[in-house]
């Protein structure tokens, strides 16, 4: 089953000084599953990388995506409608996180690779009781 990555996990992977860096890096090295990133996560992660780590890190991220090392998952119209439902239900959830949830629900994924324990732990997906938050 594929692993869906959110912004925090991608950022932690890029920033060796991030508190989550070693955990995310080691977890992803050990996994042999397809890595997926929602298309909505890309600009958010790229922005944070450029702002905090510099243009070279953002460029490496773009090169990684272009090389296909991480697959990109697009939103469907149903996903966008589900995002609206999630935003209506959870006032703490932003659009990018809602898109992560919507894609995970559509793909029937049970786990998310994320550093955001606070928000994703509070969401109740439609296909399971709760997401397993990795690493």
Residue ranges, per PLM feature:
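Short acidic, glycine/proline-enriched helix-loop-strand junctions
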Residues: 62-65, 69-76, 81, 89-90, ...
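Short, well-structured N-terminal submotif of metal-dependent ribonuclease cores
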Residues: 1-37, 50-63, 126-127
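Active-site neighborhoods of divalent-metal-dependent phosphate/nucleic-acid chemistry enzymes
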Residues: 70-115
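Alpha-helix/helix-capping structural signal
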Residues: 8-9, 40, 78, 118
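Histidine- and aromatic-rich ligand-binding microenvironments
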Residues: 3-6, 37-39, 93-95, 116, ...
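Acidic, PIN/NYN-like endoribonuclease modules and their adjacent C-terminal/linker elements
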Residues: 1, 101, 105-135
């Amino acid at each position: 089953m594929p692993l869906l990555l959110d912004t925090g996990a991608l950022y932690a992977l890029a920033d060796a000084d991030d508190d989550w860096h070693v955990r995310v890096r080691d977890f992803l090295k050990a996994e042999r599953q397809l890595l997926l990133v929602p298309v909505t996560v890309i600009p958010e992660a790229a922005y944070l990388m450029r702002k905090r780590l510099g243009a070279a890190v953002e460029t490496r991220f773009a090169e990684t995506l272009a090389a296909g090392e991480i697959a990109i998952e697009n939103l469907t119209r149903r996903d966008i409608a589900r995002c609206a439902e999630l935003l209506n239900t959870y006032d703490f959830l932003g659009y990018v996180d809602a898109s992560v949830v919507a894609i995970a629900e559509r793909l029937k994924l049970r786990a998310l690779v994320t550093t955001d324990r606070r928000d994703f732990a509070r969401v109740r997906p439609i296909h399971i009781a709760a997401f397993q938050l990795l690493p």
